[in-house]
């Protein structure tokens, strides 16, 4: 109730307990050689979460409301926790050994594309779904022998408009690893 006042030494309960169920189904398929690669793989994961009681936790979705000091905010209905939420993850990767038809003997090349889409609902547990949020990643890895690895990766966050606090957090990664 908005009208309630909190007095000195009063405890404010910011957390509670409720039943929470998550389901996840994953599948991996190796297509074998094709499209010039030695192996082509697809990973699909479907996720679902269900919370039995969302009362009193209307805006508990992580990052659902911006914090503005001294200003109360009621927020909009699309920022509220929902009883159920679901989304999917896709990852497609390919391996190519002895890249460039043997010109680079001992070099393996692995491009990968990953997609994440929170389709419907908001949840803070079991996958942290935020309706409409999407992430796409493109990654390229080159390995020389068993010891040297180069990785280049870029990620784009999009979707969910002003509710997505990761919207401006696109990232680039460059990594060199040497194992001995």
Language-model-detected regions and their locations in the chain:
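Outer-membrane beta-barrel translocator domains and adjoining extracellular loop/strand segments
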Residues: 1-4, 54-61, 121-131, 160-167
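Extracellular loop and loop/strand-boundary signature of outer-membrane beta-barrel proteins
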Residues: 8-16, 73-79, 122-127, 159-164
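Residues that define the transmembrane beta-barrel architecture of outer-membrane proteins
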Residues: 17-23, 82-88, 130-136, 168-172
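Transmembrane beta-strands of outer-membrane beta-barrel proteins
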Residues: 25, 37-46, 90, 109-113, ...
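Transmembrane beta-strands of outer-membrane beta-barrel pores
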Residues: 29-31, 46-54, 94-96, 115-121, ...
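Outer-membrane beta-barrel "beta-signal"
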Residues: 147, 167-180
């Amino acid at each position: 109730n908005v009208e309630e006042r909190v007095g000195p030494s009063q405890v404010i309960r910011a957390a509670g307990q409720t039943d929470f169920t998550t389901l996840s189904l994953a599948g991996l398929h190796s297509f074998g050689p094709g499209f010039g690669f030695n192996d082509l793989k697809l990973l699909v994961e479907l996720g679902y979460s269900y919370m039995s009681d969302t009362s009193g936790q209307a805006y508990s979705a992580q990052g659902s409301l911006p914090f503005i000091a001294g200003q109360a905010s009621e927020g909009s209905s699309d920022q509220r926790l929902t009883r159920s939420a679901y989304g999917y993850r896709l990852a497609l990767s390919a391996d190519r050994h002895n890249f460039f038809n043997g010109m680079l003997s001992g070099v393996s090349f692995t491009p990968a594309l990953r997609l994440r889409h929170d389709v419907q609902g908001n949840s803070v547990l079991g996958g942290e779904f935020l309706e409409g949020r999407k992430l796409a990643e493109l990654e390229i890895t080159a390995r020389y022998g068993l010891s040297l690895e180069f990785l280049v990766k870029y990620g784009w966050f999009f979707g969910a408009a002003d509710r997505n606090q990761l919207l401006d957090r696109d990232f680039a990664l460059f990594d060199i690893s040497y194992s001995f």
